[in-house]
Amino acid sequence: MSSVTTPAPVYTWTADEAIKFLKEWNFSLGIILLFITVILQFGYTSRSMFVYVIKMIILWLMWPLTIILTIFNCVYALNNVYLGFSIVFTIVAIIMWIVYFVNSIRLFIRTGSWWSFNPETNNLMCIDMKGRMYVRPIIEDYHTLTVTIIRGHLYMQGIKLGTGYSLSDLPAYVTVAKVSHLLTYKRGFLDKIGDTSGFAVYVKSKVGNYRLPSTQKGSGLDTALLRNNI
C-alpha cells in the first residue's frame, strides 16, 4: 500500500499581517533608514574621515546583500518570468562584483594603498611629503589640485593629511592614480600667506601607464615613474 504525500502548505501574507508588520517595525526601519541617509549625505573625506569610512562600509555591503537577495529570488521565484529576471540580475550583480575586485586589486598594485578598495571611486590622489606617501580618494580627476598648508597642517583638496610641514616641503609633482593609468600634476603656482601658511596649485601635465615611485632609499626608484603593464 503506497503512502500518499501531502503537499506542504503554501503560506501567503495577508494585508492585515503586512500592516501589522509595518506597525511593529516602522520605528526601527525609520531609524535605520535615517541613519543610512545621514551617513550617505554627509560622509565626505573633507568633513569626517570616521563618517566617511562608515559610508564606505555601507556601500561595500550593498553588493553582497544584492547578490544574496537576487539568489534568494531565484530560489523562491513566483513564476518563470520572475525566475528569468532574477537569474539575469544575479549574473549582472556577480559580474559587477568581480569587476570591482579586479579593478581594486589593479589599483592596489599601482598604489599599495587600501583605499584602492574604495567602492565609491577609482581615483586616488597621491602626494609624497618628505618620503611619506599620502593617498586619499577623490571623486574625479580634476584639471587642477590644490595643496594647502595652514600653520603646519597639510591639506589636499580640503582633506587633512598630516602635520609638521612647510611650503618648502611641497613636491614638484603630485599624482592621481587610476586603474589603467597615472595622472601627473606639476606645480604651477605657489603663494605664501604669513610665516607658516600658504598654498600651491598643481596642473595636470602628463598621463601615462605608470605606478607610484618607490620611497625606499637605495632602491634607485625614488625619482622615476615605473612602467606598469597591468
Curated annotation (Swiss-Prot):
Q: Entry's Pfam families?
A: CoV_M
* HAMAP family xrefs: BETA_CORONA_M
Q: What is this protein called?
A: Membrane protein
**Coiled coil: which residue ranges?**
none
What residue stretch is flagged as signal peptide? Answer: none
Give the encoding gene's name. M
The GO cellular component terms are: host cell Golgi membrane; membrane; viral envelope; virion membrane
Main role? Component of the viral envelope that plays a central role in virus morphogenesis and assembly via its interactions with other viral proteins.
